């Protein structure tokens, strides 16, 4: 397992390829309760760029604006319990579309969360089929939804290796955490925060730093299901 800096849930990645497939789609306003306004007021470009590594490669998403706008919840069944989160499709359409693509292609099945932090920051990092912290899906895409981003307990956000290097790795925040707004938030846990806190209470092997390592209670994904809301 690669050594990671303790202050941020980053992942190590190799260089990216330069070919880009981009799609421009309407970005919708949301009300205070998260309901999308019908009138598009801006556009957002979803660019999924072929990249290495390509672990458990499932292809590269072809952005579908209609599908991306559909609200959904993701239910992640793990060996430690079930976690459900509501995807922020209006605020992070490129990220939520990518996550849905990977989930619907069984990308996460039988993978496990490889990093738990219990000091300074409080996250459980998942989404790498190699379980090393250096794996990726074979493509990357830019950051979004960072303006004013905060990371309270229950946040689901992307891990990265620097600006605009998102892939498949993501993290759950199991306790309110202060991070710079550099990690795309794309969901909120609606059930299973207790599962995350149980895993956190089990501690880690601290192989990276004290309170930062491989979780002792390893959550392996049995499956990840997408449900329309």
Task: Say what each PLM segment does.
Residues 2-229:
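Cyclophilin-like peptidyl-prolyl cis-trans isomerases
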């Amino acid at each position: 397992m690669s050594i990671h800096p303790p202050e941020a849930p980053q992942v190590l990645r190799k260089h990216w390829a330069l070919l880009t497939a981009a799609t421009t789609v309407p970005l919708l306003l949301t009300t205070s309760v998260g309901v999308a306004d019908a009138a598009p007021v801006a556009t957002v470009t979803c660019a999924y760029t072929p990249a290495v590594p390509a672990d458990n490669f499932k292809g590269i998403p072809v952005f579908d604006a209609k599908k991306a706008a559909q609200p959904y919840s993701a239910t992640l069944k793990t060996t430690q319990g079930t976690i459900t989160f509501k995807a922020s499709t209006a605020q992070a359409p490129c990220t939520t579309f990518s996550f849905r693509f990977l989930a619907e292609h069984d990308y996460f099945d039988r993978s496990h969360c490889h990093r738990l932090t219990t000091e300074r920051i409080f996250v459980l990092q998942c989404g790498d089929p190699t379980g090393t912290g250096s794996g990726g899906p074979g493509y990357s895409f830019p950051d979004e939804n960072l303006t004013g981003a905060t990371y309270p307990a229950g946040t689901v956000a992307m891990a990265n290796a620097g600006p605009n290097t998102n892939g498949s790795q993501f993290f759950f925040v199991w306790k309110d955490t202060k991070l710079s707004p550099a990690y795309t938030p794309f969901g909120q846990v609606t059930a299973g925060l207790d599962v995350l806190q149980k895993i956190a209470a089990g501690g880690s092997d601290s192989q990276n730093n004290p309170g930062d390592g491989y979780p002792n209670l390893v959550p392996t994904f049995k499956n990840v299901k997408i449900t329309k809301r």
